[in-house]
Design a protein with these regions (language model features):
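An acidic-aromatic
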Residues: 73-124
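C-terminal motif of bacterial Sec signal peptides marking the signal peptidase cleavage site
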Residues: 16-19
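Long, charged/polar, surface-exposed segments that mediate recognition or autoinhibition
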Residues: 115-117, 121-134, 141
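One face of beta-strands
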Residues: 44-52, 61-67, 72-78, 85-89, ...
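Post-signal peptide N-terminal segment of mature Sec-exported envelope proteins
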Residues: 27-55
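Gly/Pro-enriched, hydrophobic low-complexity segments
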Residues: 135-170
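Bacterial signal peptide processing site
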Residues: 21-24
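Bacterial N-terminal signal peptides that target proteins for export
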Residues: 1-11
């Protein structure tokens, strides 16, 4: 049971990036959505540093996160207090490799059912890099979008609700 929980933890943390991650640099929050979307979509290299939290009815977890993205290559490092539970997630756009405790598991991103079968979590792996930047993924089309002052506030996509509480200029 503990091994299953440990394997699911990185996936849960990835999911929470959409709600807890700092947003990309913004210079003018009054930009209209079309120009904002174009600017965010053009970003193909970025680094995210922050903290995230997971709360369920029976437990809570927190982690520090560093996510480096360059084109389709991603490197995500998660760690708990004092570096405990260090996990590395890397991807080349086709495969996702999750390394923890000296063991690595590889998944084909194009078959999310394989990730779900292995981890128990049906995560939108391909959508996360878009969501972290404040964008809906290209497919499927989002529903129920809310845009305010040229910035995405919330949307629903592929059964997930994505909500941005605030943006930060850096």
């Amino acid at each position: 049971m503990q091994s299953t929980c440990l394997r699911a933890l990185p996936w849960l943390m990835l999911l929470l990036l959409t709600a807890c991650a700092g947003q990309p640099p913004l210079t003018d929050t009054t930009q209209d959505w079309d120009s904002q979307r174009a600017a965010l979509a053009a970003m193909d290299a970025w680094t995210l540093r922050g903290k995230l939290a997971l709360r369920t009815t029976d437990r809570s977890e927190s982690a520090s996160v560093i996510w480096q993205q360059s084109g389709s290559n991603a490197d995500l490092r998660l760690s708990g207090p004092l570096g405990a539970g260090a996990t590395r997630v890397s991807s080349n756009g086709r495969q996702l490799v999750v390394s923890q405790n000296g063991k690595a598991d590889t998944f084909d991103i194009s078959t999310p059912d394989a990730v779900a079968a292995s981890t128990g979590w049906n995560l939108p792996v391909k959508a996360l890099p878009y969501w972290v930047r404040g964008l809906p993924a290209p497919e499927p089309a989002p529903s129920m979008t809310t845009i305010d002052a040229g910035l995405m506030q919330r949307f629903e996509q592929a059964g997930w609700q994505v909500h941005y509480e605030r943006y930060q200029t850096v």
